[in-house]
């Protein structure tokens, strides 16, 4: 995802990968150039053999729509010629905005190699390099992004049991990364893929372009991420930690269960204000059909102080993820069931207003396994006019944006 614009002194800047030395004064031989500065939080070594032969010698690109596109990268489906196996080829420009970004691509490759034994992280097959690009040949996830289910009609969207299973997998993957000092920093529905759509497959975590290595002795501050999912400490330019990912998982869980983006405002400034002031609601209609345990799970993560958030390991032990079935419908759901039974018995129930605005904006599916990607956002639910009744009719408007380089307003940096 596009990094939010960084203050001049913060974060890591792309480093040069080569340089030209100058002869030392009074020395008899050429002077070796100093090593390039290492960006903080980035891995610099990979095990993969970087192939330089033409990519088309080994793979055929599939015709049709791209799997995803961003400012500096594009993902296309391809077929390995000698096996017929499907892969996703991620073409990444090495030079962006006049800067050499090869080091950041190397870091992404290194993180994928570090996580190669984890079933919930996308698998890296091999790497190619040309004069202008690096090409990552990745496992193909045929089910696409979980974002598509998040914005689907509620009848077709995730059920709570689905989210329980997928969230266990997400947390197992994130716990694996955290125990290896990797913080993802861009966890969102567009960066969680499915191995199949029907039947619902398993998850694959993708896009490590913003990820960083965090050692206990180091402190890292950077302004980056997708506006709706960034943690409060990102906005206040406080140190990043593993808890920064856990905030994003809280937002992700909220979105998967309800189809609503909890902090989304009318513009980015309002979104940032909602996050910094913790303006969120658990009273939406969608919560009526969720277990109390699910709501409690979200509450353990959407906590302003990073040190008070549940860790990935603690989340995996939460009752919502350890119980075998959904056993805690809310009081309002119980009331709705009582009304349904009363209706079957011939008793009157409050009339439900069915006048809903069903306009939705359809956009092409974008598989955002990219360093820099188009960010789609989930619009807040807009309720229709309601009378005095137990249930309200809801319509959804999903808002889609193509942000440029994000900049957090100055009043949020303090």
UniProtKB/Swiss-Prot annotation:
GO process terms (BP): apoptotic process; intracellular signal transduction; positive regulation of apoptotic process; positive regulation of fibroblast apoptotic process; protein phosphorylation; regulation of reactive oxygen species metabolic process
One GO CC term, this protein: nucleus
EC number assigned by the record: 2.7.11.1
Residue span, Protein kinase domain: 61-321
Binding-site residues, ATP: 67-75, 90
Superkingdom as given in the UniProt entry: Eukaryota
Main subcellular location of this protein, as a coarse class: nucleus
EC class: transferase
Modification sites for Phosphoserine: 9, 13, 28
Keyword ATP-binding: yes
Region of interest (Disordered), ranges: 1-40, 342-363
Expression across tissues: Highly expressed in placenta. Lower levels in heart, lung, skeletal muscle, kidney and pancreas.
UniProt keyword annotations, A-Z: Apoptosis, ATP-binding, Kinase, Nucleotide-binding, Nucleus, Phosphoprotein, Serine/threonine-protein kinase, Transferase
Post-translational modification note: Autophosphorylated.
Protein name, as recorded: Serine/threonine-protein kinase 17A
Organism of origin: Homo sapiens
Gene that encodes it: STK17A
């Amino acid at each position: 995802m596009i990094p939010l614009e960084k203050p001049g002194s913060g974060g890591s800047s792309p480093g040069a990968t080569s340089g030209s030395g100058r002869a030392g004064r009074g020395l008899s031989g050429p002077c070796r150039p100093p090593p390039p500065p290492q960006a903080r939080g980035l891995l610099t070594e990979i095990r993969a053999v970087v192939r330089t032969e033409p990519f088309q010698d080994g793979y055929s690109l599939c015709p049709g729509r791209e799997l995803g596109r961003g400012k500096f990268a594009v993902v296309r489906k391809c077929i390995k010629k000698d096996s017929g196996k499907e892969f996703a080829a991620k073409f990444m420009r090495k030079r962006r905005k006049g800067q050499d970004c090869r080091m950041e691509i190397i870091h992404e490759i290194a993180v994928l190699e570090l996580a190669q034994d984890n079933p919930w992280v996308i698998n890296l097959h091999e790497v190619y390099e040309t004069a202008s690009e690096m090409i990552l040949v990745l496992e193909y996830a045929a089910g696409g992004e979980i974002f598509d289910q998040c914005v689907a009609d509620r009848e077709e969207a995730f059920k709570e049991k689905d989210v329980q299973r997928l969230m266990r997998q997400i947390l197992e993957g994130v716990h694996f990364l955290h125990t290896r000092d990797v913080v993802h920093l861009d966890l969102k529905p567009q960066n969680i893929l499915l191995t199949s759509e029907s039947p619902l497959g398993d998850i694959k975590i993708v896009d490590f372009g913003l990820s960083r290595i965090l050692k206990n002795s180091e402190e890292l501050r950077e302004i980056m991420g997708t506006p709706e999912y960034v943690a409060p400490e990102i906005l206040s330019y406080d140190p990043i930690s593993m808890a920064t990912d856990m905030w994003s998982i809280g937002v992700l869980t909220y979105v998967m269960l309800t189809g609503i983006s909890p902090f989304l405002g009318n513009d980015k400034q309002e979104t940032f204000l909602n996050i910094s002031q913790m303006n969120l609601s658990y009273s939406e209609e969608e919560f009526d059909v969720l277990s109390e345990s699910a709501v409690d799970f979200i509450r353990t993560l959407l906590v302003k102080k990073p040190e008070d958030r549940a860790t990935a390991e603690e989340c995996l032990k939460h009752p919502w993820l350890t119980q075998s079935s959904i056993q805690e419908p809310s009081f309002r759901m119980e009331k709705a069931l009582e009304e349904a039974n009363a209706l079957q018995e011939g008793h009157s129930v409050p009339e439900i207003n069915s006048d809903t605005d069903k306009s939705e904006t359809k956009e092409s599916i974008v598989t955002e396994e990219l360093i820099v990607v188009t960010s789609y956002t989930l619009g807040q639910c807009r309720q229709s006019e309601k009378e005095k009744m137990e249930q309200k009719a809801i319509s959804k408007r999903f808002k889609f944006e193509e942000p440029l380089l994000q900049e957090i307003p100055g009043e949020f940096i303090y």
